[in-house]
């Protein structure tokens, strides 16, 4: 019934109270006496929309809509929310507390709020509503008991099930305390929401009605509240909707239909939002204030307790399980353990409220169901670990199960068809029934482990369906048979399905929102296969039904009696009438022909083309496979997230990863039009749109994203971290094509719509981090932020992004195109055999032009060609780059090589070695330039110009231009304007023609050099007259000067003259001067002596292979020797070598002599370097030997050995570069000596040795700046002698002896080393061989252990030689048998 009440101010109540306008003596002039109790606004007779009230017309109406539904910028937890009016003027900030979570409020009409998992709070005069829904509305809970307060307009209805979608709100801790809610320190802010009649009020108090009650929700702020009726009621002037100081930044007044709607306050003592009261009355449409009933704490506590049976305690001492019996006729039951019996109450007939709650306690409890139990609205709460089982197949139904934190319950009881087991609580429920459980599961908190056991037929089904909601729970599968994946759904805010290493196939993923998580949290990799594509033969055929209801898009079959044909129709809407009989379409039916197969294919194609959507998240150790049939063009859209360690595979169709548009509350178009007519264009008509600017960022991480025949797009507000493997696929990173769900926020059903949305802010752009591999005509489009490498074969790469950073990239048969406005940085090496096309775009190599480099990070960049088009085309080559490829500039583009960075003076050794690659410059470029209208700048660059080149404007700073051959013997560099400073031009001549520099308009600068390479040696009589440089006549004579350059082994200085002719000034080559460069020759000679140094190393070790052979008893032996040493010589030469030898020999006793004969193998690894070269020699060899020891003390030793050398060296003189070569050498040596014993334990041993060798000659030929250069060393047979003396002392024990020894030797060459012949354009000269000698000294130990094992260790050095051994350590071991 509808009554009219008005709010009047009461001095007693210190607030507004509701008074009937028809009550006697309650006239407008009277405010002294309460004539009527606070009652209702309008009873709730039906369920309609959501919450609301009266708001002012200064603020956009969408603010109040989003506020009430926790959408837009009012998402739970949001802080410091700034509020602006429709004119963009600042109104205030919601900064007293973070935005509360309104999910506990009934999501349809907002007249009730969940305060306990099974109880809601509202007003008792709302007698018409019988159920509530929460979250996205895909649930319904029925009221089984209204629990009306006796003296207050309040009730706390009980629900039939435990709510799983949301958590109940906290309620006020103070309750009904007079004046409590005037305390601004404790309660600084109050928020309300409701679905009452919707009005907008202007500043004149004029109301405009926007909608009736229960149509939609609105919410906002209210001021502090005064109390009356002993604190049971509170009131405030909420109707003053223009008073922001009193009522906050979003004032709202409760209207008719808002009865029961909640009032929330932030409690600073508890530091959380609490439900303070429920709205009971108002002051009429557009009135001054509202009243609320404060939550009666004692009353609700009483009602909660009334629904509980006595707690059940399991006692181990009683023995046995709690035996649970139940009489379904009476609704009474009992749990008996031993002599103790606990009564319980279940459903009585249709009365669910008769069922009471049971609380179980006692450690490791056991319950056995003897009968099936229907507990009605009664729930089970487990405080301790329990096992619930049945021996006779009994079932249980009720409100649900609560498992406390830290508690584990083993549930071995099945449910019944049509009923869901609701589980909440932070503890773990393990479901371990048997066979097929026809009941469903709804879980809202904690963990549920599905471990259903097979029955005697092998059948397993833990539940017929599983719903995971609220964001709190996790469901774990013990195997893949527990539940049909297609019956799993993630409701409001979702939760986690942990597949636990089990691979599953989903034909549908029913995820309501981002909270849905599909995960695998174990080490065993699981594969999730998506198979949502509809096959034509799976399209169901429907027939006409008298209900006249169906699903739009379904296919219907009609046997037409009028035409004797079989007709097929597609339903267009959810209701229908008769089929058309003339094979036509109308508003309800679409006629699709007479062929069943064609009709089914049409339906399947439409379904597949529409695409599929997953709002949720993929996590953990997963592979995901989505392989669609060929020809399917629909998209799989993911606007949730992914973080998986496996591979996501997509074959055919489309795949879109994108951010998620922020969901907003919305109204019908008629409401939006009505508001727009008043100047408010804020109201939205759908939850998301392509035009909205607010999107949520999403992140996707895969180990690998494998694409085959796929159209892949990374949309706005999405970050992708992965390696993409694309085969015949299109990859668009920064795709403007995006999707919205027109059903977003309203459950698991979705309605996909494709459109475009381009991010204008960097924070909203897509981001890619990783590597892209392209193959088989794939296309990569980079439109947004990109950080990664590209490996492409037979594909295309297009860049339109202004923020692309390329890592190591290799493109084979693949073009790179930079489109207008693009700005890309290749920060690491870039190699392409195809063109790089830069169209009004910028490509930077190594670093951007505005960056200053203080570290050396050299990169190599190569392309078939670098092509610039458009006046805004830019190619920037940063410092420390090695560039290769021709540069072509069509228009007035810009090419810059070198940048402005400076090299750090504190380079590491590694960086110093890297810097040596640049030959003293910061940049190296090899290629030709075709840029007749462009501006080209080079700084600290070595340009190897391998073809005729042109530039409009050229600026050179500390740059060397080397003219090299191309298609013609000589090349020309032509520029209109040249500004050159401290630069050099290296030209070539054959005494007839030469390379040439031509400057057409102006030439400026200073300190520039001209170097000339002579390809042909002129005679002393030749007179040259060859123009090298042509410039305007006004050019300064000293702009260029002749400079000496090292070419080959010589210093070459051209002789230049300057002449004016035909308005031009020319620098003419008249001749040259040449002189030998001793430094280059010395470096070459040092390098050519490497083989001699290696020979000396081998000589010094010929006789140290075996250790002491005296007094050996065995007939044969094996030995191993390891030598490590280093040496040095003139010219900064150093080497370090490691030698490994092994051999075997046999002992022959010949009268007065022991003769040892054997074979040996050897390997040596040598690193050598000097001032101008470095490299490595690896040597392999073998030989044989014989050693004779006379009993008199005399001995001899002979050996012959062959060595093969593999040499790899980098030469930094005369342009020799890398030289890899092989060489061979032979050794033959003989040593004699005599051991004189001074005592039994001391001796002295004079020695003499002669070694002959054969070293192969070596010739090297190359070209240095156009000049033929060679160096040659002849073969040589070195002969080396050595004399010296060794003395030692032996220490002996029972089974061992140790001999210490010291030696001094003089080693000398008896023949000269090989001559070295050096040749260049200046002629040939010879560096004669030489003899060398040195003193060697060392100490050593020889040890014998038993009769078979001998160890030796020796340390040696040399001095006074041109080549010396700096240190050598020799160790050997010998075993005789």
From Swiss-Prot:
Q: What processing steps or modifications follow its translation?
A: Cleaved to release the mature protein from the outer membrane.
The EC code for this enzyme is: 3.4.21.-
- What SUPFAM superfamilies does the annotation carry? Autotransporter, Pectin lyase-like, Trypsin-like serine proteases
Q: Which GO terms describe its molecular function?
A: serine-type endopeptidase activity
Domain Peptidase S6, first and last residues per copy: 53-302
Q: Where is the active site?
A: 125, 153, 259
Instruction: Name all Autotransporter domain ranges.
Output: 1111-1377
Q: What residues does the record give for site: Cleavage?
A: 1100-1101
Instruction: Identify the PROSITE patterns for this entry.
Output: AUTOTRANSPORTER, PEPTIDASE_S6
What are the protein's UniProt keywords? Cell outer membrane, Hydrolase, Membrane, Periplasm, Plasmid, Protease, Secreted, Serine protease, Signal, Transmembrane, Transmembrane beta strand, Virulence, Zymogen
Q: What biological-process GO terms show up in the record?
A: proteolysis
- Regulation (activators, inhibitors): Protease activity is inhibited by 3,4-dichloroisocoumarin.
- pH relationship of activity: Optimum pH is 6.0.
Primary role: Interacts with hemoglobin, degrades it and subsequently binds the released heme. Could make heme accessible not only for E.coli, but also for B.fragilis during mixed intra-abdominal infections. Has a role in abscess formation.
What is the protein named? Hemoglobin-binding protease hbp autotransporter
Species the sequence originates in = Escherichia coli
